[in-house]
């Protein structure tokens, strides 16, 4: 009996010591995960705010763009692709893997590769629409109205990812929608105004062939009656659409496209074997398609193609537009990390901080003069967002996925070796517990 007690005490002490040993790395991982989460959130808010401001500053006196918006997106996609390819090569060399992982060596891998074309095309549309949204609306109204992305994200969460929402969350979404509609029908100065005094010169001087082409193009347009009739019809149509609220229609379309792109991207980032795959290898495939789609815009449009061939891709660009390309690239990378190691709701929540920052800056930078309705309805928008996030419904499947991702969150940068043993052990343990419950 004494032998039994001694064995029990020794096993208990060893178990307690092992549990303490497990707690220490766990707490270290959790603190590291919190630090990475805070860094992701701050980076996303800073980059999101900078992007909105640069979009506004890069316009001309007529609140239009001297450069082609597609060229900015093409520049951003190229920067992201080069960065992810360099990091992917680093990961492959460290893990001793084959470079075939960056391509497609079979029919099945080719079909899997094509999955990344869907979010790439949606992001292409999203990044293109935002230029015209900022041209039609004040930045403060644009970011406030873009909160409707919470509604579209929640709807797609339920349909695509089968996520559950409580009745309180649905009620808060309805309040959010009605508040945003009330904001858009207010009497404040909601339409965009050009920023005076912040229009720097172009970074490149047009060549002789460029000047000759633009001059001939203007002469051709001035003698083309069909062009003027088409321009008159377009201006009348745009005026009618603007009075109808074209900026809000475009922003509503962008909210749906953005939510769909982020949800589909999160789905393929985390499904099956992709959960433990390097984010740089995954994003290399995504940004390759993004580069193709943005290149097609410049190639298929006759005016864009001729202007790019004669004047170059940097024609009309200024310091703000070039900075916009780098900020857009960094913002896209931060969104990818959020979708991989957090989720869409964290992405949407941090976006609300961007809303507050941009709205505050609009008072000082863009002469934003809101009506009394704005001050009454804006707090309701933020309050409904708070109610939505404070009344989350427990979803066992989502909690299980977050538990599996917790190890990756804590070792987001150390994980480049790609062993993934802890994740496999955790997955195996969860699978065994599920099978025991089913048998019971």
Swiss-Prot record:
Give me the Cytoplasmic side stretches, as residue ranges: 1-34, 88-104, 162-164, 265-278, 340-345, 389-440
Q: Which GO terms describe its cellular component?
A: Golgi membrane
Q: Name one GO biological process term.
A: transmembrane transport
Q: Which residues form a coiled coil?
A: none
Question: Which GO molecular-function terms appear in the entry?
Answer: antiporter activity; pyrimidine nucleotide-sugar transmembrane transporter activity; transmembrane transporter activity
Glycosylation is annotated at 224, 306
> Keywords for this entry?
Antiport, Glycoprotein, Golgi apparatus, Membrane, Sugar transport, Transmembrane, Transmembrane helix, Transport
Query: SUPFAM superfamilies per the record?
Result: Multidrug resistance efflux transporter EmrE (SSF103481)
Q: Transmembrane ranges?
A: 35-55, 67-87, 105-125, 139-161, 165-185, 244-264, 279-299, 319-339, 346-366, 368-388
Lumenal compartment: which residues? Answer: 56-66, 126-138, 186-243, 300-318, 367
Where is the region Disordered? 1-22, 419-440
Give compartment(s). Answer: Golgi apparatus membrane
Chief localization class? Golgi
Q: How does it assemble?
A: Probably forms homooligomers.
Q: What does this protein do?
A: Probable UDP-sugar:UMP transmembrane antiporter involved in UDP-alpha-D-glucuronate/UDP-GlcA, UDP-GlcNAc/UDP-N-acetyl-alpha-D-glucosamine and UDP-N-acetyl-alpha-D-galactosamine/UDP-GalNAc transport from the cytosol to the lumen of the Golgi.
Record protein name field: UDP-sugar transporter protein SLC35A5
Upper lineage is: Eukaryota, Metazoa, Chordata, Craniata, Vertebrata
What gene name is given for the protein in this entry?
slc35a5
């Amino acid at each position: 009996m004494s032998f039994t007690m001694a064995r029990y005490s020794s096993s208990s002490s060893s178990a307690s010591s092992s549990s303490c040993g497990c707690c220490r790395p766990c707490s270290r991982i959790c603190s590291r995960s919190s630090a990475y989460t805070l860094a992701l959130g701050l980076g996303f808010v800073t980059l999101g705010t900078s992007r909105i401001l640069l979009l506004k500053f890069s316009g001309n006196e007529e609140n239009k763009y001297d450069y082609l918006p597609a060229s900015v997106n093409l520049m951003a996609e190229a920067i992201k692709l080069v960065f992810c390819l360099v990091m992917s090569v680093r990961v492959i060399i460290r893990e001793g893997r084959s470079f075939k992982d960056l391509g497609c060596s079979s029919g099945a891998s080719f079909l899997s590769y094509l999955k990344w074309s869907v979010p790439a095309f949606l992001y292409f549309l999203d990044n293109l629409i935002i230029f015209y949204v900022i041209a039609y609306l004040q930045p403060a109204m644009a970011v406030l109205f873009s909160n409707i992305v919470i509604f579209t994200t929640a709807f797609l969460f339920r349909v695509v990812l089968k996520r559950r929402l409580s009745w309180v969350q649905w009620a808060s979404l309805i309040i959010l929608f009605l508040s945003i509609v009330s904001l858009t029908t207010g009497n404040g100065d909601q339409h965009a105004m050009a920023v005076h005094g912040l229009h720097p010169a172009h970074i490149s001087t047009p060549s002789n062939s460029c000047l000759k082409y633009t001059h001939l193009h203007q002469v051709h347009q001035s003698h083309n009656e069909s062009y003027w009739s088409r321009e008159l019809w377009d201006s009348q149509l745009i005026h009618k659409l603007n009075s109808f609220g074209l900026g809000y229609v475009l922003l509503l379309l962008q909210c749906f496209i953005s939510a769909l792109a982020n949800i589909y991207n999160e789905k393929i980032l985390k499904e099956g074997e992709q959960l433990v795959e390097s984010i740089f290898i995954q994003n290399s495939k995504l940004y390759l398609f993004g580069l193709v789609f943005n290149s097609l815009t410049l190639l298929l449009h006759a005016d864009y193609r001729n202007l790019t061939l004669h004047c170059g891709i940097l024609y009309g660009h200024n310091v703000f537009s070039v900075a916009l390309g780098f900020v857009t690239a960094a913002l896209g990378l931060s969104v990818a990390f959020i979708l991989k190691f957090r989720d869409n709701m964290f992405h949407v929540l941090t976006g609300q901080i961007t809303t507050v920052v941009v709205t505050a800056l609009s008072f000082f930078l863009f002469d934003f003069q809101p009506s009394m309705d704005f001050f009454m309805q804006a707090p309701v928008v933020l309050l409904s967002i708070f109610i939505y996030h404070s009344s989350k419904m427990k979803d066992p499947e989502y909690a299980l996925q977050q538990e599996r991702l917790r190890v990756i969150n804590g070792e987001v940068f150390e994980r480049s070796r790609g062993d993934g043993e802890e994740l496999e052990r955790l997955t195996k343990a969860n699978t065994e517990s599920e099978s025991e419950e089913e048998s019971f």
